[in-house]
Amino acid sequence: MKCLKAAYIREEIQIPDKVKVSLENNVLKVKGPKGEVIKDFSYAKGIRIQLNEGKIILETTFADRRKKALLYSIIAHIKNMITGTINGYRYYLKVISTHFPISVKVSGDEVQVSNLIGEKNIRRAKILPGVKVTVKGEDIVVEGSDIYNVAQTAANIESSTKIVGYDRRIFSDGIYIYKKEVIGLEQSD
């Protein structure tokens, strides 16, 4: 069966009052109370992005499966940008040490992990721009307005403590992501 193309697809995203949005050469800037997120959509060939009367309008013509998927992915990115600038995103990580006490500290634009399974060298994880990392005992909190930078920073911290050559069932030492949330939309447990 042949896949039919949609002749015309138009989707609108309402811009909240707290948010300022600007568009220039397919570079979308969303600014809100929690910060500013900039994303370049110039890779999206065949998809037109416009600002009109408090709405972001996305249009495409003769959309096949790939173009539709790209359109709705861009919509999800824009909604994440708006949510991030209004509320922000937060990731929680836990320091697990069974054999040697792990020491974690933030230094400039990196997180330094020392004494992981007794290693003398310091493992480093890069903190991406616009992300704040705080260490409180065995808990690490990563927060910011850009979900992609927050998630990548948390992943950098987690992967910097990956142990190779040991049985993971016994040597469970490391730093692990255990919770993700939108700030202000916390759920009571």
UniProtKB/Swiss-Prot annotation:
InterPro entries for this protein: Ribosomal_uL6-like (IPR000702), Ribosomal_uL6-like_a/b-dom_sf (IPR036789), Ribosomal_uL6_a/b-dom (IPR020040), Ribosomal_uL6_arc (IPR019907), Ribosomal_uL6_CS2 (IPR002359)
Keyword field: Ribonucleoprotein, Ribosomal protein, RNA-binding, rRNA-binding
GO molecular function, one term: structural constituent of ribosome
Listed GO CC annotations: cytosolic large ribosomal subunit
rRNA-binding keyword on record: yes
Pfam family, one: Ribosomal_L6
Domain of life (superkingdom): Archaea
GO biological process terms, semicolon-separated: cytoplasmic translation
UniProt entry tagged with the keyword Transmembrane: no
Known partners and oligomeric status: Part of the 50S ribosomal subunit.
Family membership: Belongs to the universal ribosomal protein uL6 family.
Record HAMAP family: Ribosomal_uL6_A
Task performed by this protein: This protein binds to the 23S rRNA, and is important in its secondary structure. It is located near the subunit interface in the base of the L7/L12 stalk, and near the tRNA binding site of the peptidyltransferase center.
Full protein name: Large ribosomal subunit protein uL6
Species name: Sulfolobus acidocaldarius (strain ATCC 33909 / DSM 639 / JCM 8929 / NBRC 15157 / NCIMB 11770)
Organism taxonomic ancestry: Archaea, Thermoproteota, Thermoprotei, Sulfolobales, Sulfolobaceae
